[in-house]
Amino acid sequence: MHSFEANFTKIIFFTIFLVFLFINHSFSDHLTVKVTGFKDASSPIYIWGYDRKFYFDNDSAPLFMVGERDINNFNQINLKAFPHLIVGLFVFQDIDQNGIFSKNFKGDPLEPYGFSLNPVQGYQEIVFEDIAFDMNKFEKIEINLNN
């Protein structure tokens, strides 16, 4: 009788674990990014997604990087199954096609770029809180590139 109770308890815990594993979906299967304001249709567009303020502030280690080279998909880029709820997006068009965001010697951007939620930049730096959004609350994000 004791082994039946022990086995039954293990089965119950395993079942509860599986239920919690499959019920809590922490990804977006419906988020679409529309990019506007790009310079020419022959240069790829890159989307970098950040989930941590530290990595965004240090310009390193994005959670994901999506590159879109197909001219027909420039306006609609699907972001599916990324594992975090709160993200901030940085988008740029790679005019010189070297795969990196190019800046001049002063650190000013040489390529069109934009952020999720399109914050007004003025003369201050963009912080993570200005671009972060909940992936479950949006179905479509439109990002305007600054030239």
Where in this protein do the model-derived segments appear?
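Sec/Tat signal peptide C-region and signal peptidase I cleavage site
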Residues: 23-28
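A short, amphipathic beta-strand motif
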Residues: 31-39
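Acidic, glycine-anchored loop motifs typical of Ca2+
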Residues: 94-103
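Extracellular beta-sheet/turn segments enriched in Thr/Pro/Gly and aliphatic residues
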Residues: 110-147
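A short, solvent-exposed beta-strand micro-motif common in secreted/extracellular proteins
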Residues: 85-94
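Short Pro-Gly-centered beta-turn/loop motif in secreted/extracellular proteins
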Residues: 71-86
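Bacterial N-terminal signal peptides
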Residues: 12-22
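Bacterial N-terminal signal peptides that target proteins for export
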Residues: 2-13
